[in-house]
């Protein structure tokens, strides 16, 4: 069985509106795919399914696509849900 850890999730823009919070602490497996982490968040906030294709994670300030990338999380890690970024 994979050990679990507490991580801090930060929500921005539409994801914060849907979740109704700007941040929260949740317990997740330490070893988890990015897509599985997203599913855990959708279970907490089902409306997040609406923005799944519009966001990426930032894990310890590194961008991570919501795919099959394996994450090795540590207690207290910060995972941000980043909305689309436009630049010019």
Swiss-Prot record:
Residue(s) carrying 1-thioglycine: 88
Gene Ontology biological process: Mo-molybdopterin cofactor biosynthetic process; molybdopterin cofactor biosynthetic process
PTM info: C-terminal thiocarboxylation occurs in 2 steps, it is first acyl-adenylated (-COAMP) via the hesA/moeB/thiF part of MOCS3, then thiocarboxylated (-COSH) via the rhodanese domain of MOCS3.
Main location: cytoplasm
Pathway field: Cofactor biosynthesis; molybdopterin biosynthesis
InterPro entries, per database record: Beta-grasp_dom_sf, MOCS2A, MOCS2A_euk, Mopterin_synth/thiamin_S_b, ThiS/MoaD-like
GO molecular function: identical protein binding; molybdopterin synthase activity; nucleotide binding
Coiled coil: none
One Pfam match: ThiS
Gene Ontology cellular-component terms listed: cytosol; molybdopterin synthase complex
Transmembrane segments: none
More info: This protein is produced by a bicistronic gene which also produces the large subunit (MOCS2B) from an overlapping reading frame.
Protein name, as recorded: Molybdopterin synthase sulfur carrier subunit
Organism: Mus musculus (Mouse)
């Amino acid at each position: 069985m994979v050990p679990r850890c507490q991580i801090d999730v930060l929500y921005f823009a539409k994801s914060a509106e849907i979740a109704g919070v700007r941040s929260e602490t949740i317990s997740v497996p330490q070893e988890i795919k990015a897509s599985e982490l997203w599913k855990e968040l959708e279970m907490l906030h089902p409306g997040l399914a609406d923005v799944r294709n519009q966001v990426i994670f930032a894990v310890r300030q590194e961008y991570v696509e919501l795919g099959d990338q394996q994450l090795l999380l540590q207690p207290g890690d910060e995972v941000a849900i980043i909305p689309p970024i436009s630049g010019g």
